[in-house]
Amino acid sequence: MHGRQELPYHYAQLTICTTHQLLRFYHAFDNLIIDEVDAFPYAANASLLYATKQAIKENGGCLYLTATPGDALLREIKSKRLVVNYLPLRYHGHLLPQIKVRLAFGWRRRLERQQLPPQVIQQLQETLREGHRFLLFIPHIADLALVEAALRHSFATFRFATVHASDPERLEKVQKMRDGDYDFLVTTSILERGVTFPEIDVYVLGADDPVFSSSALVQIAGRAGRAQSRPTGRVVFWINCNCRQVNQAISQVKYLNRKGQRLIDGVSFV
C-alpha cells in the first residue's frame, strides 16, 4: 500500500505498506516490522511513531530494523525498554568490507580547475581495469557538474551519469545502473540506502564534509560487498582531515565485524 495506489485495501495476512499508511489502521496488526527505522520520513516523526503504536493490536509486537540506530533508539536499548538483537553477517556469511581512509588534500581547489587528485583517478581506474563498477559519493549537488567534467577527461570511454534527489531521471538512471548500462554513478547521499548493485566498489570524496553523518557513512559503505559472487567489495573514503564521523563509521563497522567473526567461529555473544 502507498499513497498513489488506486486499488482499495482488502484484508490480507501480509500487508506491505509505507509508514504513512499506518495512519489508516487501528489495532489491525498482530506484528509490525518497520524497516530503516532511522531514516526519513520515519525518524523523528512523532505522527508516524504514534501511527505505529495505534496500528498494532494490544498484545501485538513490533520489530525495528536498522543498520544504524539513532540516539533515541540507543537510549531505549540502554534503558532496557527495547530488546536488541544483532545480525552482523549478511546472507552470504562474509564480514562487512572494511573502510579504508585516504588523504586527498585540496581536492576542491583541483575541482575548480576540473581536475581530481591523481590518487583518486588512479583508484577509480584500478576498479574499472579489474572489471568492476562503482559508486562515487560526493557531498553536495553543486559538486556534481564539476566532478562530472573532471571525470570526462580521464574516463571518456566509460558510461556514467550523475544523480541526486531532485534529478527527474533519478529512477531511470538507477535502473540503468542495475541493468549494467553504466560503469559507475556519481551521486549524492541519495543512494546511501535502499539500492543494491552487485559486485561494486564504493568511494566517498570528501567524507569529512559535515553533510555526511556517521550513520550515513556506514550506510554508504554498506552498498559494497552485497553479492555472493563478490562479497568483499572495496570501500575508500577520501578526506582533507581527520574527523569524528569518519572515525565513528569505521568503529561501527569494526564492531559489527567482531560480532560477525565470533559468529563465524561459533562463539556466542551478547
Region locations from a protein language model:
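Conserved helicase motor
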Residues: 1-10, 17-24, 139-142, 160-172, ...
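Loop/turn-to-beta-strand initiation segments
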Residues: 11-15, 28-31, 57-65, 132-133, ...
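Residues immediately C-terminal
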Residues: 22, 38-42, 70-71, 143, ...
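Post-DEXD/H (motif II) to motif III coupling segment of the RecA-like Helicase ATP-binding lobe
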Residues: 27-107, 113-115, 119
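A short beta-strand element within the Helicase C-terminal
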Residues: 29-36, 184-186, 192-208, 218, ...
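Conserved segment of the helicase C-terminal RecA-like domain
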Residues: 56-72, 214-217, 221-254
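Conserved interdomain linker/interface between the two RecA-like ATPase lobes of SF2 helicase motors
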Residues: 81-144, 148, 155-160, 263-264
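Non-catalytic, charged low-complexity extensions flanking SF2 helicase motor domains
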Residues: 250-270
